[in-house]
Amino acid sequence: MAKKVDGYIKLQVAAGAANPSPPVGPALGQKGVNIMEFCKAFNARTEKFEKGMPIPVVITVYSDRSFTFETKTPPASFLLLKAAGLKSGSGRPNTEKVGTIKRSAVQEIAETKAADMTGADIEAMTRSIEGTARSMGLVVED
């Protein structure tokens, strides 16, 4: 018989840096999950990522206080800023451009995000990532 799901918790945690402090501790504590067990498992699973990279995670909590979790790919905005070599996007993206990014880099990011995105094909996903880049004040070049 399958376990009864008590709830889902969605967080963004830095790779290899999960610890009991906020936001992880309070979110897991209110569901009665063993916080240190999650932190150790998450840090072990995210070793392959660059330290400090934000990793979205969906934690499924069961009625017996056990849990499973699924890590997603890093946010497109983080990957775009990293590819462009910037710290942050533009506060006024329509008037103030902060950098440029090659279309090939956008295509690479779309391929990385393909597992998490619901899109018809890679071209549609690439256009979606290009839109994200433009909304951050980045100019997409060929």
From Swiss-Prot:
Keywords: Methylation, Ribonucleoprotein, Ribosomal protein, RNA-binding, rRNA-binding. Forms part of the ribosomal stalk which helps the ribosome interact with GTP-bound translation factors. This is Large ribosomal subunit protein uL11. InterPro entries: Ribosomal_uL11, Ribosomal_uL11_bac-typ, Ribosomal_uL11_C, Ribosomal_uL11_C_sf, Ribosomal_uL11_CS, Ribosomal_uL11_N, Ribosomal_uL11_N_sf. One or more lysine residues are methylated. Part of the ribosomal stalk of the 50S ribosomal subunit. Interacts with L10 and the large rRNA to form the base of the stalk. L10 forms an elongated spine to which L12 dimers bind in a sequential fashion forming a multimeric L10(L12)X complex. The gene is rplK. GO terms for cellular component: cytosolic large ribosomal subunit. It comes from the Bacteria.
